[in-house]
């Protein structure tokens, strides 16, 4: 049985999606030109925090929450803005970005290096409270 590795899938995704560095993302966030979406598991947010004003959409729900035909669709998101996804290191967000491109989204990208690089860029990180 020949199975592709997860790294192979990430590498393939990265060849067909837009990848942004944290400095560019910081500029887009500062100018309110994007929706920054944290796709990490909620436990990661509780432990490490999240970028202030980012939206949390768990990776497992992303396609459903961004599908206008789905009962899970989040109408509150301004989908006219650039959508930028991030995870911890940039692998899950690469796969998720590829999925949104496959759905037909054009103005979507992900963060190279993920949450760690966003923190290093100076974007404000806030604590995510447990409900």
Model-derived segments and spans:
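Active-site flanking residues adjacent to catalytic metal/cofactor-binding acidic residues
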Residues: 37
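Rhodanese-like catalytic fold shared by cysteine-dependent sulfurtransferases
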Residues: 1-34, 42-82, 91-131
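Short, surface-exposed ligand- or partner-binding patches at beta-edge/loop junctions that are enriched
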Residues: 86
């Amino acid at each position: 049985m020949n199975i592709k590795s997860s790294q192979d899938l990430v590498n393939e995704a990265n060849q067909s999606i837009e990848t942004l560095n944290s400095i560019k993302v910081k500029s887009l966030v500062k100018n309110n030109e994007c929706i920054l979406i944290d796709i990490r598991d909620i436990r990661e947010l509780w432990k490490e925090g999240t970028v202030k004003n980012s939206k949390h959409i768990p990776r497992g729900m992303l396609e459903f929450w961004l599908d206008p035909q789905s009962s899970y669709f989040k109408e509150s998101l301004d989908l006219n803005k650039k959508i930028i996804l991030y995870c911890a290191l940039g692998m899950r967000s690469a796969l998720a970005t590829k999925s949104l491109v496959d759905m037909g989204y054009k103005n979507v990208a992900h963060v190279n290096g993920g949450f760690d690089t966003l923190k290093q860029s100076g974007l404000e990180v806030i604590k995510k409270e447990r409900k």
